[in-house]
Amino acid sequence: MSEPSAEGQQTILVVDDEAEVRALVREVLVMHGYNVIDTGDPFEARRIVEAQPIHLLLTDVVMPIMNGLELAKRIEAISPTTKVVLMSGYSTAAVKGSGRPMISKPFKANDLVSTIRQMLDSKSAFRRPGPPPAPKPGFGPL
């Protein structure tokens, strides 16, 4: 695991059970000025998010302890402003149906950085589709 962020830098938490993937992602993102914290343990990821601000969670989908979709839900529950990007070597219906941005493994460094930048520059975090708002009283069909 790396050190906490320097003031002014955006912090990205990378969660992947493969140390080689974490090392590669770290190298690419640090070269582009991001502060990177990484772990192979989704439960440690949760503790990290509870302890400090994380701007973006980059998580593998297929992991032995907890899948990335479940981790994303748990992180969003405790830190709604943390943005999420999924990584996967598989493009399953569940991943596609999640509505979250996904980086396919193996990935190109430029694609990784572009996706991360786009998410961090966006104005809002991922929002699961919910029911439409209730109509206001007195404003029914005319």
Where are these regions (language model features)?
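Non-catalytic signal-transmission and effector/linker regions of two-component phosphorelay proteins
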Residues: 1-13, 26, 73, 81, ...
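Charged docking surfaces used in two-component/phosphorelay signaling
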Residues: 23-31
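Short hydrophobic/Thr-rich beta-strand motif most characteristic of the beta2 strand and flanking loop
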Residues: 33-40, 48
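Acidic catalytic/metal-coordinating carboxylates
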Residues: 40-44, 67-71
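Active-site residues of response regulator receiver
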Residues: 60
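Receiver (REC) domain active-site loop signature in two-component systems and cognate sites
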Residues: 63
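A Lys-centered signature of the CheY-like receiver
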Residues: 105
